[in-house]
């Protein structure tokens, strides 16, 4: 019996050449709507779906393949005598190939002016039904949903006269991944439209961006996936201009650096190591900002990741060229800057739109046996809600330093302490199990620069010991959430040493 293929695609990439190859193998082709028209315009002989179903396409194409003559031909088990007898009795012919991809729901809802009605109209019904039927019966049916697989199928047909069983299984698995992702997009869209924040089930879909050499360590396998609607201001959508492929650790560090530099509207540069900032500087231009970020910690910046929120110019590139760096990420690089930096063949140069999100996206964290979901911490300092419980208020310069330190501390692993002075960080204490331990690290790193600096803490002081350490180091201003039952003890210490202290009422733990 002559083999038959059903072809109905929204993505027309390569379909004419593929169908031509099928016809050359003696395979009869059935098609629908726009696909049929395209194939016929290219001189290919195909059969209309209505000739198979004996029923016209109706309801603006909503119903065309939902018919027993189609699904019987797809689902029939060819070595089952009962199935074969029923097919013969009802005049159903088998379908051996299904070439289908689905209505462009993702592309539709990505449009800024999309209406709810447009989105609903682009939910495919017949397509998923066909490919699921074919994939279930993959022992007898080859189902192709991705143009990438056209050449594989044709090559096996030309070589063996049939598609290998292993290939059919792989294609079937791809179908169910495809429909699962498609349905996840639809369910998430409708859930968001209804304003449901914590649905009873959560289905997420990501698209592979690249395989990675390894994970956090060489013995760990890893892959990088991107969210279908991730912000363009993200590492997932960055353009790599130069250098080696990004590693797992590179991606984590670049993401951390990008998150911090987005906090600033003035020219800013952030240096990151192991997802913690080691130096942050702001200035009147990007060269000045980089100089301050470098001077913040000239030791730790070696082998680090740099993020800037302005174009990298030649003079800044020349300074960057002087040290070993893994990545530089910026909105753009001048032609002269690229010439300087591309002389380092392994240095990764990325461009990305630097834009702070105004809405909190969801942050997913895997734990053993489950998944934690929360809003991203995008909250900025609200000066209308702060309080100053100390006798002295911060000076103008102290306010500048406090604000810089507060922007940075929310991105440091808790317990977190950041010291800032003269438009740059001068000490970062990260990830200690007690707050005073982080303070001591930051103060030690700052050395003599701690005198007259500002301190930010991501959470309140449970005891006044951190204030005591700050006072001994000559720190003159502190910003912290407040809210401890021992706040009064800290306020007394601050007043004793003439320290200005600001309560924000907002905690910024980061784990």
Swiss-Prot record:
GO cellular component, one term: cytosol
Domain of life, source organism: Bacteria
SUPFAM superfamilies tied to this protein: Cytidine deaminase-like, Methylglyoxal synthase-like
GO molecular function (one): IMP cyclohydrolase activity
Disulfide bond annotation, renumbered to this chain: none
InterPro entries per record: AICAR_Tfase_dup_dom_sf (IPR024051), Cytidine_deaminase-like (IPR016193), MGS-like_dom (IPR011607), MGS-like_dom_sf (IPR036914), PurH-like (IPR002695)
Pathway(s) of this molecule: Purine metabolism; IMP biosynthesis via de novo pathway; 5-formamido-1-(5-phospho-D-ribosyl)imidazole-4-carboxamide from 5-amino-1-(5-phospho-D-ribosyl)imidazole-4-carboxamide (10-formyl THF route): step 1/1; Purine metabolism; IMP biosynthesis via de novo pathway; IMP from 5-formamido-1-(5-phospho-D-ribosyl)imidazole-4-carboxamide: step 1/1
CDD domains to which the protein is assigned, alphabetical: IMPCH
EC number: 2.1.2.3, 3.5.4.10
Domain MGS-like: 1-145
GO biological process: 'de novo' IMP biosynthetic process
Domain notes: The IMP cyclohydrolase activity resides in the N-terminal region.
Family that this chain belongs to: Belongs to the PurH family.
NCBIfam families: PRK00881.1, purH
Keywords for this protein: Hydrolase, Multifunctional enzyme, Purine biosynthesis, Transferase
UniProt-recorded name of the protein: Bifunctional purine biosynthesis protein PurH
UniProt KW Zinc keyword: no
SMART domains named among the record's database cross-references: AICARFT_IMPCHas, MGS
Catalytic activity: (6R)-10-formyltetrahydrofolate + 5-amino-1-(5-phospho-beta-D-ribosyl)imidazole-4-carboxamide = 5-formamido-1-(5-phospho-D-ribosyl)imidazole-4-carboxamide + (6S)-5,6,7,8-tetrahydrofolate; IMP + H2O = 5-formamido-1-(5-phospho-D-ribosyl)imidazole-4-carboxamide
